[in-house]
Amino acid sequence: IYQPTSGQILLDGVDITHLSITERANLGLSYAFQQPVRFKGLRVKDLLSLAAGKNTSVNEACSYLSEVGLCARDYVDRELNDSLSGGELKRIEIAMVLARGTKLSIFDEPEAGIDLWSFQNLIRVFEKMYEQTRGSILIISHQERILNIADKIVVIKNGQVEKEGARADILPALLGSADAGSPACSVLADK
């Protein structure tokens, strides 16, 4: 994780700039990596329990797995090892974020390694999170398709904020530009 060279990172008015990942998580921030971390030796249910901070029942674990498009009975007792594909690991990681129920959920290119059918399911997961969330969802993506579910879009180019505003204001200009492939951060929920 890079340390910022200037500025602050605030979460609910609290400066979290120099806090560890664990300290940030304890304040209600979750992060799903572009390349999911492999927790070898753990079962999927155990990982979901760790994420939730409590012993998750099989029914709860199955609910989280079903929400991300995995057949729960095939995964709940499965070990996290090299037999899982990148897309499966990505979905399990998103299920972990759902289990945590945090104030701010950050997803770094959640569509990476996921096929088109799963991508549509992923969009539905984010829409459901948006409807049920008490916090905010931040999605970092290069995919135009994911921008359609954003409330707010922030376009970052060469490390600087280039454009920021409501989807209705930013998306038409972004899609019409030659730089439509620029990275964009989409804030879905800001409650």
Language-model features and meaning:
Residues 93-94:
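Hydrophobic anchor residue at the start of the ABC signature
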Residues 142-148:
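Conserved H-loop
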Residues 8-24, 81:
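ABC ATPase NBD Q-loop/coupling interface
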Residues 35, 41-60:
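Q-loop/switch helix immediately C-terminal to the Walker
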Residues 119-132:
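Helical segment within the ABC ATPase nucleotide-binding domain
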Residues 97-98:
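ABC ATPase C-loop
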Residues 106-110, 117:
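Walker B catalytic motif
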